Every structure is written in structure tokens, then in C-alpha cells.
């Protein structure tokens, strides 16, 4: 969890609603309007900033749901929790605590945290989350296939399924918190599931080590099995000091975003042009460089837009955590433009993390959903983005 407050890298900010965390930055006022999108803040931990208030939603990060239309599961990096919502933001009663290394669930988990007076021990720091389509990844200590799987900045991967005791605790299935050494363990920023010729695997972006760590199904020890790939997810042309930050499975290919590491190799260093995106197959072979520098600024969220998403229908959308902007690319990796608001200003979402199409309970698969950790990751936001009407007249 980053402790540094981040600026939006913009010379001006326009608040779209009273107390809103959504802003439009006036960096490029001279260009003509090319597109228009509207943001709906659904859930926030801060009163008045969204339709629903949930104090547990701090630094909202990864999002997952089942194809059968489960609620949206949203990882709360600041509170060590995964909270559940409908597509309209209605909260579901279940919330799941993510354990620290050693399967410890601190009392602070799934409770609001004061960043100026953090608890000791602090809760876990979940990031990426996936719905598990495989029966081969079991919750440790059970014969239950995991339903949702969570990665953390603590260097762990945890699993959850219905029927656990207690029912609201995930269980650690892989622990690299001390690998290669205590105090220098893995920092997982993202997680996806993918299929290769060898079967189903989990792929975790290890920001500290600069690797994609791969896990196969449950082994004889009851834990997920470390795996290797033929290609190793290597790109010798990525500059030193950059590491895998986000990861997404788009049409069977793995898109990996790279951000600049800070001195501790725990958090990113935001800045214009600080970012790269590569495309790999699920056996770790580099297929192509998709994007380099340019509009990228600590890119993390990435998805393909629906084919009912206005001017950017079907395009690859890449969200910048560093400045909160959303960039549209064609399939070749050619940058097209940024998303604008209805007034022609670049759309900015402070602390932007996930971009994902709908599909969870009460949502449309044409709607783009997002999460964010505004105000230096101390607060949280879950919402959606849809095409907007451009105002007419002066």
C-alpha cells in the first residue's frame, strides 16, 4: 500500500460533482472534441462521493465475478478485505477477509482503517482477484475447488469457496512473502487465470522481483504448485528499473503492463511516459510490444471495450494509475486518443486501478466498470463509465 500522495499530473482539475473524486484535467484544451464519456460513482468509503457509502472500500483494486452473474467482488487493498456489490452498487452482506502470511487474519481486517493511525498489525493488502474456472485449484485443507483467488502485496495468493469455516476467511494457497528472503519477498500487484497447452495456470505480477510468477493446480502439500513456462515472460528491451505491474487476459493473450519501480521495489514511480505494455502467450513467449511510453503513466488496468462503447467500441483501453487517464489503442497498439468527458476535457479518475466490462449481478456487459484508490490510496471508489452526449451550443 503506497504511503505517498499522488498528484494527477494535470494543470487544472474540474470537479464533476460536489465532493466527487472524479476530475477532468485541462492539459490539452486546444484539441477538438473527439469523444465523450460519463462517470457514475457507485460506491465510496467517503460520504457524499458516490451513491452508496461503504467504509470498508478503501483503495478499491481488483475486480472479479463469475460468468453466472455473481456480485462484483472488489478487493479492498486498504482494509484487507473483498467486498461484494451489485452492478448498481448495492452491497451484499458477505465480505471476505484476506489473510496475512501465516494465515493470520488481524482484527482490523474488513474494518475502516485510519491511514494516519494505522492498526498493528495492519490488514493484508489484496490487489488482483480472479474467478476460478478450474476444479484443480483447491482451497488448502479442503476438497473444495476455489471459487475466487486473491493476490496480495504481502506476497501471498489465497483461495476462497463457499462452505469454509469460518465462511468469511480466505486461506493462503501460496506464500512467497519471504522469497527470496524475509523483508525482500514477492509483491504481487496483479493476477489472472489462463489456459495453455499444459492446462490452467495462475499468473501473478511480482513487482519486486520483476517477474510473472506462475502457479499450477494444488499439489501433494495442499498448496498451489509453482510452475515454469518455456518463454519465461522475458523482454530484454524493457529498461532496467521497470517491472510487471498489471496483467490481463484478453482473447487468450496475456497483456502485461510495466511501471517504474521505487527504491524499495514495492511501489511505482509515476510520471509521463513511465510505462510499457507487452503481449505474451500463456507459455511466457513474448508475442509483441504493444505500447511504449507516450501517454502511459504507471499503467495498470487494461481491457477490451465492448462494441457498444461509442467511438472506442472494441478498442483496447489502458488505464493509468499515475495520472488517472484512460487511453484507447487499436489492436496493433497504435494510440488513438484519451477518453474525454462531455465537455471535451480528458477524463481523470484519481488512483485508477481496474477497468473491466460488466457481467456481475445487475450489470450490462456493455458497461465499463472501474475501481480506484483516490487521495494517495487512502480512499476508495467503484463505479462505471458509459458513452455520453456532447452538449450542444456555446
Predicted regions and their residues:
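Sequence/structural signature of beta-propeller domains
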Residues: 26-394
